[in-house]
Amino acid sequence: MAKKITGYIKLQIPAGKANPSPPIGPALGQHGVNIMEFCKAFNAKTQADEGTITPVVITVYADRSFSFITKTPPVPVLIKKTIGIESGSSVPNKNKVGKLTKAQVEEIAKKKMPDLNAASVEAAMRTVEGTARSMGVDIVE
Protein backbone atom coordinates (compact mmCIF):
# COMPACT_ATOMS: atom_id res chain seq x y z
CA MET A 1 0.00 0.00 0.00
CA ALA A 2 1.17 3.52 -0.79
CA LYS A 3 2.28 5.83 2.01
CA LYS A 4 -0.15 8.54 3.10
CA ILE A 5 1.03 12.00 2.03
CA THR A 6 0.68 14.71 4.68
CA GLY A 7 2.03 17.64 2.69
CA TYR A 8 4.22 19.19 0.04
CA ILE A 9 6.92 21.78 0.68
CA LYS A 10 8.25 23.93 -2.18
CA LEU A 11 11.59 25.66 -1.64
CA GLN A 12 14.28 27.32 -3.75
CA ILE A 13 17.68 26.45 -2.32
CA PRO A 14 21.20 27.11 -3.67
CA ALA A 15 22.49 23.75 -4.95
CA GLY A 16 24.87 21.99 -2.58
CA LYS A 17 24.32 24.58 0.16
CA ALA A 18 21.28 23.32 2.10
CA ASN A 19 21.65 23.80 5.86
CA PRO A 20 19.23 23.66 8.81
CA SER A 21 19.05 27.45 9.23
CA PRO A 22 16.01 29.43 8.02
CA PRO A 23 14.21 29.14 5.66
CA ILE A 24 14.87 25.39 5.33
CA GLY A 25 14.83 24.39 9.01
CA PRO A 26 11.47 25.93 9.99
CA ALA A 27 9.74 24.79 6.77
CA LEU A 28 10.78 21.16 7.30
CA GLY A 29 10.51 21.25 11.10
CA GLN A 30 6.81 22.10 11.13
CA HIS A 31 6.17 18.97 9.05
CA GLY A 32 8.33 16.80 11.35
CA VAL A 33 10.93 15.97 8.70
CA ASN A 34 14.49 15.08 9.75
CA ILE A 35 16.18 18.31 8.65
CA MET A 36 19.80 17.06 8.58
CA GLU A 37 18.82 13.97 6.60
CA PHE A 38 17.18 16.18 3.94
CA CYS A 39 20.13 18.59 3.83
CA LYS A 40 22.64 15.75 3.32
CA ALA A 41 20.52 14.08 0.60
CA PHE A 42 19.86 17.40 -1.21
CA ASN A 43 23.51 18.49 -1.09
CA ALA A 44 24.67 15.09 -2.37
CA LYS A 45 22.19 15.21 -5.27
CA THR A 46 22.97 18.81 -6.30
CA GLN A 47 26.72 19.11 -5.67
CA ALA A 48 27.46 19.25 -9.44
CA ASP A 49 25.56 22.58 -9.82
CA GLU A 50 27.04 24.16 -6.67
CA GLY A 51 25.56 27.60 -5.92
CA THR A 52 22.81 27.64 -8.58
CA ILE A 53 19.33 28.26 -7.15
CA THR A 54 17.44 24.96 -7.43
CA PRO A 55 13.69 24.59 -6.86
CA VAL A 56 12.80 21.48 -4.88
CA VAL A 57 9.42 19.89 -4.08
CA ILE A 58 9.51 17.80 -0.91
CA THR A 59 6.74 15.25 -0.35
CA VAL A 60 6.18 14.54 3.35
CA TYR A 61 4.55 11.25 4.37
CA ALA A 62 2.52 10.35 7.47
CA ASP A 63 5.43 8.37 8.99
CA ARG A 64 7.56 11.57 8.77
CA SER A 65 9.64 10.19 5.93
CA PHE A 66 10.06 12.25 2.78
CA SER A 67 11.02 12.19 -0.87
CA PHE A 68 12.03 15.13 -3.02
CA ILE A 69 12.23 16.15 -6.65
CA THR A 70 14.68 18.80 -7.85
CA LYS A 71 13.69 20.93 -10.81
CA THR A 72 15.71 23.01 -13.26
CA PRO A 73 16.81 26.48 -12.08
CA PRO A 74 14.34 29.37 -12.66
CA VAL A 75 14.58 31.09 -16.08
CA PRO A 76 15.86 34.43 -14.65
CA VAL A 77 18.72 32.58 -12.93
CA LEU A 78 19.66 30.86 -16.21
CA ILE A 79 19.49 34.18 -18.11
CA LYS A 80 21.68 35.97 -15.54
CA LYS A 81 24.20 33.11 -15.62
CA THR A 82 24.29 33.09 -19.46
CA ILE A 83 24.99 36.80 -19.90
CA GLY A 84 26.97 37.17 -16.68
CA ILE A 85 25.00 39.84 -14.83
CA GLU A 86 24.25 40.11 -11.12
CA SER A 87 20.61 41.26 -11.43
CA GLY A 88 18.08 42.44 -13.98
CA SER A 89 17.17 46.05 -14.72
CA SER A 90 15.03 47.93 -12.19
CA VAL A 91 13.40 49.80 -15.11
CA PRO A 92 13.43 47.22 -17.94
CA ASN A 93 11.66 49.47 -20.47
CA LYS A 94 14.37 52.18 -20.15
CA ASN A 95 17.63 50.58 -18.98
CA LYS A 96 18.87 47.50 -20.83
CA VAL A 97 21.38 45.35 -18.95
CA GLY A 98 22.48 42.93 -21.67
CA LYS A 99 21.74 41.03 -24.86
CA LEU A 100 20.74 37.42 -25.54
CA THR A 101 21.00 35.77 -28.96
CA LYS A 102 18.27 33.49 -30.32
CA ALA A 103 20.71 30.56 -29.96
CA GLN A 104 21.20 31.32 -26.25
CA VAL A 105 17.43 31.64 -25.78
CA GLU A 106 16.94 28.26 -27.46
CA GLU A 107 19.61 26.68 -25.24
CA ILE A 108 17.90 28.02 -22.09
CA ALA A 109 14.47 26.90 -23.37
CA LYS A 110 15.74 23.36 -24.04
CA LYS A 111 17.32 23.18 -20.58
CA LYS A 112 14.07 24.40 -18.96
CA MET A 113 11.70 22.33 -21.17
CA PRO A 114 10.93 19.52 -18.63
CA ASP A 115 9.55 22.05 -16.12
CA LEU A 116 7.68 24.35 -18.52
CA ASN A 117 4.15 23.56 -19.66
CA ALA A 118 5.03 24.56 -23.23
CA ALA A 119 4.05 22.26 -26.09
CA SER A 120 7.12 22.95 -28.23
CA VAL A 121 10.60 24.43 -28.01
CA GLU A 122 9.32 27.51 -29.89
CA ALA A 123 6.67 28.12 -27.20
CA ALA A 124 9.30 27.65 -24.49
CA MET A 125 11.55 30.14 -26.32
CA ARG A 126 8.74 32.73 -26.28
CA THR A 127 8.38 32.21 -22.52
CA VAL A 128 12.14 32.71 -22.01
CA GLU A 129 12.12 35.80 -24.29
CA GLY A 130 9.27 37.33 -22.26
CA THR A 131 11.16 36.74 -19.02
CA ALA A 132 14.31 38.26 -20.54
CA ARG A 133 12.40 41.37 -21.70
CA SER A 134 10.91 41.85 -18.23
CA MET A 135 14.47 41.76 -16.83
CA GLY A 136 15.69 44.45 -19.25
CA VAL A 137 17.58 42.06 -21.55
CA ASP A 138 17.39 42.60 -25.33
CA ILE A 139 16.87 39.66 -27.70
CA VAL A 140 19.04 39.89 -30.83
CA GLU A 141 19.17 37.64 -33.89
Swiss-Prot record:
Q: Does the keyword Signal apply?
A: no
Give the matching SMART domains: RL11
**PROSITE patterns, from UniProt?**
RIBOSOMAL_L11
Q: Which domain of life is it from?
A: Bacteria
This protein's GO CC annotations = cytosolic large ribosomal subunit
Keywords from the UniProt entry: Methylation, Ribonucleoprotein, Ribosomal protein, RNA-binding, rRNA-binding
SUPFAM superfamilies in the cross-refs: Ribosomal L11/L12e N-terminal domain, Ribosomal protein L11, C-terminal domain
- Please give the NCBIfam families that the UniProt record associates with this protein: L11_bact
Protein name in UniProt: Large ribosomal subunit protein uL11
Native source organism of the sequence: Trichlorobacter lovleyi (strain ATCC BAA-1151 / DSM 17278 / SZ) (Geobacter lovleyi)
Q: Lineage of the native species?
A: Bacteria, Pseudomonadati, Thermodesulfobacteriota, Desulfuromonadia, Geobacterales
